[in-house]
Amino acid sequence: MGFGDFSTICTKAAIPLCALVGEQQINGGAGIQTNCYSRTIEIANTLIFQCANDFMHILAMVMTVIMIIHVRSKFTAVGRKEITSVFYIYLLLTIISLILDAGVTAPGSAPYPYFAAVQNGLVSALCTCLLINGFVGFQLYEDGTTLSVWLLRLCSLAMFVVSGAVSLLTFKNWAGLSSKNPIGIMIVTYIVNAIFLFVYVVSQIILVVGTLEDRWPLGDISFGVFFFVIGQVILYVFSDTICDNVQHYIDGLFFATICNLLAVMMVYKYWDSITREDLEFSVGVKQHNWEVKELLPDEDKRGTVYQDSDYTPSLYQQQYNGRHSHYSNLGH
């Protein structure tokens, strides 16, 4: 297997781009046959591919919407707008992956190469967005500002265009690129994205160790890396083995989708653990923090039996201690 050759990858994992790269031995067309596919089912005269994996995609969309709602509810948290972009891109990626895996656009159809190119572009955009989010915690620039938000959006869009264009040109054999030698896809989709993810993880470890007193966020990072790596290993190494041993009911894509979802959830958990709301400027949904601006004169106080009650020093008079601030330890 040479660099840029997808033969070994595609014979084990039924990823969408495998139907568009390489060369078939029978008719000389593009496409690499996978050793084992997950079962298809027929519903209302419609074939649905990768049923178990489709269910996980739907679950991933639901969980992503929940995470977006939780992030948006933290009105004053550091990096709220930036991290929300990560989940929006992941949501779009999950929708496109569901369309491809379920066979809504079947291999060989005219729209299939375009959807596969969009999928690769969204993968690159997601990794780029996550990379830039990694620098928000260092407060090199103010989060939530036009500079911060549009820097993230434009960089993510640029990588989406580059990766999507390279993929589409390769699939269509345009601009001198060939589907029989998809080295450009290997570089943009795998090598560059792997570097971005590595830099993100290292930067967050440096952030936690160098600036935060709490070490618990390292656990979130570790679990996120663990789930992601396990998912990739299962997909690209053991997918065909799993498929054969369970009589084609599931394959590596099913476990890879689960692990990717868990990794994204760890990204949310990590962000939530190192940020907090500024309670002075936020309004909680479930908490009602009342501030007494001016005390009433003694003659205006209403006489009540509760003034001399043993229950006067209630819990509501105790000072509220918010959770520890982590980003507040950093200087602006």
From Swiss-Prot:
<keyword id="KW-1133">Transmembrane helix</keyword>
<feature type="transmembrane region" description="Helical">
    <location>
        <begin position="121"/>
        <end position="141"/>
    </location>
</feature>
<feature type="transmembrane region" description="Helical">
    <location>
        <begin position="182"/>
        <end position="202"/>
    </location>
</feature>
<feature type="transmembrane region" description="Helical">
    <location>
        <begin position="51"/>
        <end position="71"/>
    </location>
</feature>
<comment type="subunit">
    <text>Interacts with CHS3.</text>
</comment>
<dbReference type="GO" id="GO:0015031">
    <property type="term" value="P:protein transport"/>
</dbReference>
<dbReference type="Pfam" id="PF12271">
    <property type="entry name" value="Chs7"/>
</dbReference>
<keyword id="KW-0961">Cell wall biogenesis/degradation</keyword>
<keyword id="KW-0653">Protein transport</keyword>
<keyword id="KW-0813">Transport</keyword>
<comment type="similarity">
    <text>Belongs to the CHS7 family.</text>
</comment>
<dbReference type="GO" id="GO:0006457">
    <property type="term" value="P:protein folding"/>
</dbReference>
<feature type="transmembrane region" description="Helical">
    <location>
        <begin position="86"/>
        <end position="106"/>
    </location>
</feature>
<dbReference type="GO" id="GO:0005789">
    <property type="term" value="C:endoplasmic reticulum membrane"/>
</dbReference>
<feature type="transmembrane region" description="Helical">
    <location>
        <begin position="218"/>
        <end position="238"/>
    </location>
</feature>
<dbReference type="GO" id="GO:0006031">
    <property type="term" value="P:chitin biosynthetic process"/>
</dbReference>
<feature type="transmembrane region" description="Helical">
    <location>
        <begin position="149"/>
        <end position="169"/>
    </location>
</feature>
<protein>
    <recommendedName>
        <fullName>Chitin synthase export chaperone</fullName>
    </recommendedName>
</protein>
<dbReference type="InterPro" id="IPR022057">
    <property type="entry name" value="Chs7"/>
</dbReference>
<keyword id="KW-0472">Membrane</keyword>
<keyword id="KW-0812">Transmembrane</keyword>
<keyword id="KW-0256">Endoplasmic reticulum</keyword>
<comment type="function">
    <text>Chaperone required for the export of the chitin synthase CHS3 from the endoplasmic reticulum.</text>
</comment>
<dbReference type="GO" id="GO:0071555">
    <property type="term" value="P:cell wall organization"/>
</dbReference>
<feature type="transmembrane region" description="Helical">
    <location>
        <begin position="248"/>
        <end position="268"/>
    </location>
</feature>
<dbReference type="GO" id="GO:0051082">
    <property type="term" value="F:unfolded protein binding"/>
</dbReference>
